[in-house]
Amino acid sequence: MMSVTVETLENLERKVVLSLPWSEINAETDKKLKQTQRRAKIDGFRPGKAPLKMIAQMYGASAQNDVINELVQRRFHDVAVAQELKVAGFPRFEGVEEQDDKESFKVAAIFEVFPEVVIGDLSAQEVEKVTASVGDAEVDQTVEILRKQRTRFNHVEREARNGDRVIIDFEGKIDGEPFAGGASKNYAFVLGASQMLPEFEAGVVGMKAGESKDVTVNFPEDYHGKDVAGKTAVFTITLNNVSEATLPEVDADFAKALGIADGDVAKMREEVKKNVSREVERRVNEQTKESVMNALLKAVELKAPVALVNEEAARLANEMKQNFVNQGMADAANLDLPLDMFKEQAERRVSLGLILAKLVDENKLEPTEEQIKAVVANFAESYEDPQEVIDWYYAEPSRLQAPTSLAIESNVVDFVLGKAKVNEKALSFDEVMGAQA
């Protein structure tokens, strides 16, 4: 094969000019036309018996194009191997204006290469290691949340209070005129749960079933409904029903409802503690991992290949559309999401992928079979039948990709924590879990 010069363009972009001998193009085209001749069914001729000259007239141009495309791909692969080029993404091929050699046809291949990844001094990086604990107080708090999730509402004949569920009819008007979304019949909500604007809820508090009143509500300037933002509305509200909240007692029935067959409350609390501890551990590990990944991005000067960033952005866009479809938005698959809105996230992911690959290779951080099994077991632990989940993962090798990736990330986190300056940060239960009430 003739020597080929690799021209450096901007950043990671490279260019090579591929030369395809016309003799090879013509020979391959003739071969393809003969194959077409054997399959061709043309009026006036028996199948496969049409003259080759006629086949060439009918299919010659498309056959030659196919051959050139095939040869270009093959020649580019050969050049990449010979020149030890680490090609990122797919090349684009362009015609060359100066076809000065009558013996060959020239095509330019423009492509990107993977950047050289050099891991900087990790000891100079600061990493935040997040910690949190789960004790009796956190179990009590979680049990209270579980009680609230099982709230029952019972009809009462009294004025409405915060915490009650009310059913109302309402009609709102701005400057005496009704507006879109401003009216409803038998609308149910819980007072004090911030489901409605504060002035609206305050107007309902103290009302009894059967009463009606007008309530003035000022919509905030940043209200999500742009047509009413910053405006004042008068709502005519009729209260139809008041129901008082009743929380279940923490007893055997409550424990059974949470899956404790014998209703033992102590066992229930242990199960709650185990589940909450697992979730807290997952969340603090995620925060620590995020800090480690940020440190790696600081430690490595890296320009991610544009082709890979674009591919990842497209993947993220498709993922978002699929999520919309899964949520019931049937036409979401046709949404035209601009890729620019995903570029920053895509660039981060591609960069981290390159850095982690280098780090794992240099420091032998590939996970062991036992580590992957541990990740799968952790996944399965929260399900009713853990063994069924484990069997599902191991029934198809491709399903182990996610657990393997998590095991790799865990090894990377441990490695970086062993090298960097680690600052421990203890978080409260509420800080880890977010506001839950």
UniProtKB/Swiss-Prot annotation:
Top EC category: isomerase
Question: GO terms for molecular function, please?
Answer: peptidyl-prolyl cis-trans isomerase activity; protein folding chaperone; ribosome binding
Gene3D superfamilies reported in the protein's UniProt record:
3.10.50.40, Trigger factor ribosome-binding domain, Trigger factor, C-terminal domain
What EC number(s) are associated with this protein in UniProt?
5.2.1.8
Under the heading InterPro entries, the entry gives: PPIase_dom_sf, PPIase_FKBP_dom, Trig_fac, Trigger_fac_C, Trigger_fac_C_sf, Trigger_fac_ribosome-bd_bac, Trigger_fac_ribosome-bd_sf, Trigger_fact/SurA_dom_sf
Query: Does Isomerase appear among the keywords?
Result: yes
What's an example GO BP annotation here? cell division
Write down the chemical reaction(s) this protein catalyses: [protein]-peptidylproline (omega=180) = [protein]-peptidylproline (omega=0)
Q: What is its main location?
A: cytoplasm
Q: Briefly, what is this protein's role? A: Involved in protein export. Acts as a chaperone by maintaining the newly synthesized protein in an open conformation. Functions as a peptidyl-prolyl cis-trans isomerase.
Under the heading HAMAP family, the entry gives: Trigger_factor_Tig (MF_00303)
Q: What is known of its domains?
A: Consists of 3 domains; the N-terminus binds the ribosome, the middle domain has PPIase activity, while the C-terminus has intrinsic chaperone activity on its own.
UniProt protein name: Trigger factor
To which species is this protein native? Answer: Neisseria meningitidis serogroup A / serotype 4A (strain DSM 15465 / Z2491)
